[in-house]
Amino acid sequence: MSPTKQSAGAGTAESAAQDAPRFMNVRQVAHYLQINEKKVYALVNEGRIPATRLTGKWLFPRDLVDQWLLESSHGGLLTDRIVIAGSDDPLLYRAVTLMAAELQGRALVSYAAIGTQLGLSVLARRRADVCALHWGPDSESLQRHPALLRQHVQHKDWILVRLFRREQGLMLAPGLWSGDSRIEQLFSPEVRWVARQEGAGSQRFLREIIAEHRLDPADRRTTARAYSERDAASAIATGQADVAPGVRAAAGEFGLEFLPLGWEAFDLAMSRGIFFRTLFRGLLDVLRGAECQRLAQVFGGYDCSGLGNIVWTA
């Protein structure tokens, strides 16, 4: 290409960038990216470009498109890592492990199970890209989860993405529960409990169960402490305790009995830009894949029908 043509091409790109409005339509974003409009629609249909539909028309926020370009470029901004914090989940843990094995050294996907509220604090400080959370029954998740996010000033930049519904209840040592048992019996002095940290979704769940059955939390005998769902299940499996709040999947993973008490939503909070990051899209693909869906059946207590759907925006 001659210097004259190179100069003209550079001038066209620079002019497109300068003239682009804050919210672009299909024609404008095609001009901005120097691609045809059919390619824009293809990117939208594949969920690969930041876009929103308003009154039947697609709009493309220029700031998010710019970030998407940086993150989609080879070796681009932060394309090689994604950090997940917050609530623990066996299936999400397996998906992260599978993805890390597939990526080898090309990228880093990490998962720190530190509880719902601490996870949101870490997300707000930008020490994590994604926060996994659960906070009460599925029927109230669209009120409770956004309310948690609104406790942070950064919530205006966040969205909530549904991973799945999980069956919540009590994880029990084998043989502890029989057909004629009652929840009240689990609060007798001889039954040993795993304590969870404040701010954990499972601890919140336990408080509601205690209130519903008009029990006294002081009656519990605590012999172990856990900071994640799987740690609590491990404490029971290794004989340190008899009961802990948790999901069916964690109980199944560690060979425990399970007392079902309801379903909850398990969501991911993140900025809009992260949702379109290549690594995050890859994580959703792994969760939809045959191996993770097989594991969901093995563990039990999962409903993955809404996986990847955006359920709330600020």
What are these regions (language model features)?
Residues 2-37:
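Polyanion-binding surface elements
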Residues 163, 172-193:
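Flexible hinge/capping segments at coil-to-helix
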Residues 135-149, 233-262:
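A ligand-binding cleft/hinge motif common to bilobed small-molecule-binding domains
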Residues 65-88, 96:
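A short, Lys/Arg-enriched interface patch at domain edges and termini
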Residues 22, 154-169, 252, 256-285, ...:
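Periplasmic-binding protein-like
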Residues 78-88, 183-203:
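Short loop->beta-strand "edge-of-pocket" segments that line small-molecule binding or catalytic clefts
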Residues 77-78, 94-172, 176:
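N-terminal segment of the mature folded domain
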Residues 26, 50-72:
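Short helix-start
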